[in-house]
């Protein structure tokens, strides 16, 4: 009736859980956001096949790019679970309610793959890079612990990004699945799966790294618990948890997304981690280079970094290297199965990245890969200090830290007699007040290791400074970004009013030759972030 004779379509429908009645909501006679997600989840390239169908091919004439042995008419079959979670940026938009509704408010999304729903869910939650390590079991859960059960039961009915964590807290307190379902109307199947995570947490909370058996390690990892979550639960260091797990012989294996549940061989390696026995990473003796992607799109870190990662993969492949991409964003080109020689759809966390490095080292017969951290924005930069220095290709972690750490950068400029606004670094309000007494208002307050002006403020008076420092005390999500401490000071310096801002992009090779790629003058006055300012070249 609609008239779509060839090509792709997207149909959305609703199911009544009480009686199974189905109601069609809408149809899109084209590929859509969900088509892209389905393609990444299954390895079946819907858009590519839809366009071939539109010019006259039939499904049985189009080969499956992953297996090369089956036609496109062979429907994808999966033996894993995929979880997609949107990435919201309400922290960038103060004053918004944070309540989800019929209008899209997310700025990005993550996708995770696991053998079970609990494993996939916890991997997706830690992929968001919003300070959560999984379904609670992390320092951020302490905020929920202060709220009464009655109040949580009221809040769980409101669709917000935090609702899943509220559900986890209620289940942890012993509230039944039926009671939570009645309050929030989330399908009981999902609540049952989340309760499996809570039950496993209860089962191991009184243990410790040295007391865990191999079977216990495998059980807790198969429901998605990260080493960082277990370290929090046991009051241990993450490195201690990792060492104990590896000593017990429990390391992740990598399975392949192959569209056919392993019925045919996959020629395009597209992997996800789990804790089983057989590893499917292909062995070879070529030099491998791992490119760490940018994670979910957000305000200040988007597709421009994915562009860099993708072209780096193409260039390295042309130079004879075996390219390995690590990312968790289904909206990107970097997570296409044919962009790199091998793709790991994994969270960009210390544990997951070190696991990929270990797997690649083993598959290369002990030859360690190189790792590029400078192309994916702040996400891989924050991980640079947790990766062995000898593995990092390009800019060293020490140089990255020198440029990103406000205190070190200020000291460098001062030693080189480079002019800069007067100011200083502070780790508390008292120190910040001392600085403004010396330099005067207005001042610019900036944390280290941020992108897109995250948590930066132009401050005009003492009351505003008090509020800004209070907000920074609770700010943070990953690595060195967050909080106020000796390791995470903020820069408080004089704001230059009526100034013109200029960006210079340069690239340097190992011989010392420098090429200036562009000089951009901002149209907006200083104080407007470069991402929000028009600019002109030259």
PLM segments and residue spans:
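A generic structural signal for short coil/turn motifs at secondary-structure boundaries
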Residues: 34-37, 299-302, 400
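C-terminal amphipathic alpha-helical interaction region
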Residues: 229-280
């Amino acid at each position: 009736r609609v008239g779509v004779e060839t090509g792709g379509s997207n149909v959305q429908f609703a199911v009544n859980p009480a009686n199974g009645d189905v109601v069609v909501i809408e149809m899109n006679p084209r590929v859509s956001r969900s088509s892209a997600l389905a393609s990444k989840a299954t390895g079946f390239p819907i858009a590519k096949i839809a366009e071939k169908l539109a010019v006259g091919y039939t499904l049985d004439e189009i080969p499956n790019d992953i297996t090369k042995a089956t036609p496109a008419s062979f429907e994808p079959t999966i033996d894993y679970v995929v979880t997609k979670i949107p990435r919201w940026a309400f922290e960038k938009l103060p004053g918004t309610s944070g309540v989800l509704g019929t209008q899209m408010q997310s700025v990005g999304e993550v996708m995770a793959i696991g053998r079970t729903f609990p494993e996939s869910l916890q991997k997706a939650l830690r992929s968001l890079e919003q300070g959560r390590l999984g379904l609670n079991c992390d320092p951020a859960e302490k905020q929920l612990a202060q709220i009464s059960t009655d109040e949580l039961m009221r809040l769980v009915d409101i669709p917000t990004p935090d609702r899943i964590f509220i559900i986890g807290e209620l289940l942890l307190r012993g509230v039944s699945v039926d009671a939570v379902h009645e309050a929030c109307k989330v399908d009981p199947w999902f609540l049952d799966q989340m309760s499996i995570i809570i039950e496993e947490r209860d089962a191991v909370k009184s243990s410790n790294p040295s007391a865990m058996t191999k079977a216990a390690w495998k059980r807790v990892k198969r429901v998605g618990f990260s080493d960082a979550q277990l370290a929090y639960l046991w009051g241990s260091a993450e490195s201690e948890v990792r060492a104990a797990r590896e000593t017990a012989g429990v390391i992740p294996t990598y399975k392949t997304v192959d569209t056919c549940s392993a019925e045919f061989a996959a020629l395009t390696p597209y992997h996800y981690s789990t804790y089983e026995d057989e590893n499917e990473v292909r062995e070879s003796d070529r030099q491998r280079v791992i490119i760490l992607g940018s994670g979910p799109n957000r305000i200040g870190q988007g597709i421009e970094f994915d562009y860099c990662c993708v072209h780096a993969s193409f260039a390295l492949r042309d130079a004879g290297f075996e390219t390995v991409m690590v990312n968790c964003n289904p909206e990107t080109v970097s997570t296409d199965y044919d962009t790199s020689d091998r793709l790991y759809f994994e969270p960009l966390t210390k544990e997951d990245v070190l696991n990929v490095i270990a797997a690649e080292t083993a598959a290369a017969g002990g030859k360690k890969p190189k790792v590029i951290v400078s192309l994916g924005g702040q996400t891989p930069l924050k991980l640079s200090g947790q990766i062995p220095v000898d593995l990092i290709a390009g800019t060293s972690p020490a140089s990255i830290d020198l440029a990103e750490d406000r205190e070190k950068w200020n000291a460098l400029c001062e030693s080189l007699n480079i002019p800069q606004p007067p100011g200083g670094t502070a780790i508390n309000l008292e120190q910040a007040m001392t600085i403004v007494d010396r330099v005067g208002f207005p001042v610019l307050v900036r944390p280290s290791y941020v992108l897109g002006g995250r948590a930066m403020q132009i401050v005009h008076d003492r009351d505003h400074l008090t509020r800004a420092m209070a907000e920074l005390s609770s700010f943070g999500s990953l690595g060195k970004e967050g909080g106020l401490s000796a390791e995470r000071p903020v820069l408080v310096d004089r704001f230059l009013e009526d100034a013109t801002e200029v960006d210079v992009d340069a690239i340097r090779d190992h011989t010392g030759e420098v090429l200036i790629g562009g000089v951009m003058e901002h149209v907006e006055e200083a104080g407007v972030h470069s991402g929000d300012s028009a600019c002109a070249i030259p």
